[in-house]
Amino acid sequence: YSFSVNVEYFDGDATDQFFLKLAYTDANGEAQYATVAEGTAVKGEWVQLANKNYQIPADATNMVLYVETAESTNNFYLDEAIGAVGGTSILGAGESKPFHLGDVNADGVINGMDLALARQGVSGAFSGNAARLAADVDQSGSVNGTDLQLIQDYLLGKITEFPIAEKTVDTAAMEKLFAGITPAASYKAEGENNPLFTQRFGADPGVMEYNGRVYVYTTNDVIEYDSNGNVTENTYAQVNKINCISSDDMVNWTDHGAIPVAGTEGIAKWATCSWAPCAAHKTINGKEKFFLYFCNGGNGVSVLTADSPTGPWSDPLGKALITRATPNCGDITWLFDPAVMVDDDGTGYLCFGGGVPDGKDAMPGTSRVVKLGEDMISLAETPVTIEAPYLFEDSGINKIGDTYYYTYCSNWNTSGNSYGMTSGAIEYMTASNPLGPYTYGGELFPNQGKFFGLYGNNHHSICAVNGQLYLFYHNRSVEKAMGIEGNYRSPQVDQITMTDTKINTVTGTMKGIAQQKSVNPYVKNPAEMMSDQAGINVRGLGDTVVTEIDKGDWIKVSGVDFSKGASQIILTASSKSGCAVKICTGSPTGKAVGYAEIPAGGKLSEVSAAVQGLTGNQDLYFVFSGQAEMDCWIAK
């Protein structure tokens, strides 16, 4: 067959790549997408996409012809879409002439004729839009004396490429624009560092320190609805991903995305759920390896492995690590909630289990600890029972000094106990051996409802960072701020203090931890690193991008050290329809230090904002006027 269509666009870059494609279903029932024709269009000029001898695959059904761009989201127009017998030449706009800045007549070279045509265009008119775009060598949007001088300098050998003009931002117009924009509301109050992130929920924090950076892995709670669209109680049935965030200052957290663990799209496709993660790293055969343990509902503990704390992750076993067929595990009520520790000698230990058999509130006997194999994905011995009084769930295992600590959540029937413990609280036990026996030590964290008013299951991790101990736990602060109630949880952190081997009671706060170090603005910082936000989301995995930005949305980066000053901030961002960014300090309504304009077209590009007044330690805000995505930023 012979196919042809004409394409034209008016937004974005000077050129764009277009494809005429055929979507079809093959004999195996799989969707296929084949290129019929392609071409490069110059903005404002028609281009023809044509192939006069295209062979449609013999097994193709459900066929659709369509046009798309290579990367951008530019609006475009189509005309004269024609199909004919193979070999037919279809008259159309034809191919675009080669486009190069400075080559005004499109003859493939830049010479005196191009300079003459550019001068003629400045004083009169260009032969077409392609000629005008080629003469605009500094890409300022207009052709003027600056372009003529640059072409002349190029011909004289003074320059070898054309510099891009910095767009002058109309500050008065920007001030007027943002005066009419109300910043979106955050789920955190000013001065609060808890919860750690708010763009998604995140429960059951499992924490790992690696090279001075803290990685927090959480159950990705998903809001559930009834048939009428009302929020219902969290059943955890839809949880098949694990969130990963990290920080080196305990306040600004980088969102590495939600790891697809279970289900048909997951890494462990045989699993249905991914709850209560924990993580560890270990040097094996001279190489650092990372291990992410999770539970497949209440019926087994599984493990993923990677060469980096953010993945990509793989399923080394293709099945659970611990099941009810594992010795001494068949009668565990809830076979879940793993916690892992790598001892000083490199030996790994895993705790797990939970649940309260009928009549055994005081001593459920459902917790286990096991020595792992050298590979961290096998068991070296039979799991040992931990006699933890009033156990409910949520195991933890740590070595502090020379003492091993087993920590857990107490059950809901603790009244009258002899230990002085309360219900749904984090308790601790101590031992001189990671396999026990353990002796009850005390209560280190009451139920979070005591501090925040919303009671629920308690789940924690203890992690040492730079010699300081921290308690990570979850709370229901974000769902409260959203005005919903269904046990949807978010991670928080507060400091642990000790008296000898006694863990002092931790107080839960919304203020959280003070920032441990300043942010360096003179290196590229990911946009997904933030201390607070309103309205945004994050897409991707590992190397992510801030997305779903709309009018009034914003990102906050706390404690940025501008001791060297700054004259510009460069953003890497995109917008389908164009977007302005207000860069300010103190609050989303604070005084602007500069503005940036993201061009339309949907293509990630660097945009620069001239800034002034940035000195000392500042909380930096990026406030947006419309739809956008943002990848990173750097100050110069």
Residue map of PLM features:
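Carbohydrate-active catalytic/glycan-binding domains of CAZyme proteins
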Residues: 170-594, 599-636
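Trp-centered recognition loops
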Residues: 6, 43-50, 60, 288, ...
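Beta-strand acidic-aromatic groove motif in beta-rich domains, primarily in extracellular
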Residues: 11-25, 63-65, 76, 291, ...
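Surface-exposed loop/edge segments in extracytoplasmic proteins
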Residues: 28-37, 589-595
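Extra-cytoplasmic beta-strand recognition segments
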Residues: 1-19, 49-56, 65, 80-85, ...
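Cellulosome-associated attachment modules in secreted, modular CAZymes
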Residues: 90-172
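Short edge-strand/loop segments of extracellular domains
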Residues: 21-30, 373, 588-589
